Amino acid sequence: MRILLTNDDGYQAAGIRALHAALKAAPEGYEVTVVAPDRDRSAVSHGITTLEPVTVKEVEPGIWSCSGTPVDCVNRALRQVCVGTPPDVVVSGINEGENLGTDIVFSGTVAAARQAVMYGIAGIAASLLPVSDFGTGCRFQALARFVARHVRALAALSSEDVLVNINARSAQAYARACYARVASSDI
């Protein structure tokens, strides 16, 4: 399975690094390519860059930095980096902070998964709610392992008009998962 990994926090962010490591370590032997923003691009929604050039450069083997938005990253990956070998799934994240309810409208993380779906490619967004107790922040490893273990099943849930949006609390491990539809924050 070929996986394109991106985010909106930047290619050096802890969340994408943890997810990249978990996917590469998975026994399934996933082929993982990272194309992610060169800096934090949080809350840019489905923005695309139109008034300046968008550049990509390989900063490590298989890891590309992009000067544009998360949607630009998906576009450049498909047109420049993954030419001839398109991904089977685009995984965006792990975002530091939740993407729930109407917040998904503003999320660059979710927008990248949505862009994949618009191309007919399965799209998965993964976000983590930080632990506020004692300022411990996000612990990405458990969610990274969960996504790596279940990426095929999660990709199968995506369709021509459905992306998968995962939100989890920082934890050591996850015992179960549940499905929910997007709801407004007014509920």
From Swiss-Prot:
Its cofactor is a divalent metal cation. Binds 1 divalent metal cation per subunit. SUPFAM superfamilies: SurE-like. A divalent metal cation binds at residues 8-9, 42, 95. The keyword Metal-binding applies. Keywords: Cytoplasm, Hydrolase, Metal-binding, Nucleotide-binding. GO terms for molecular function: 3'-nucleotidase activity; 5'-nucleotidase activity; exopolyphosphatase activity; metal ion binding; nucleotide binding. Its EC number is 3.1.3.5. It holds the Pfam family SurE. The keyword Hydrolase applies. GO terms for cellular component: cytoplasm. It catalyses: a ribonucleoside 5'-phosphate + H2O = a ribonucleoside + phosphate. It is an enzyme of class 3 (hydrolase). It is found in: Cytoplasm. It comes from the Bacteria. InterPro entries: SurE (IPR030048), SurE-like_Pase/nucleotidase (IPR002828), SurE-like_sf (IPR036523). Nucleotidase that shows phosphatase activity on nucleoside 5'-monophosphates. PANTHER family: 5'-NUCLEOTIDASE SURE (PTHR30457), 5'_3'-NUCLEOTIDASE SURE (PTHR30457:SF12). Belongs to the SurE nucleotidase family. This is 5'-nucleotidase SurE. It comes from Treponema pallidum (strain Nichols). The gene is surE.
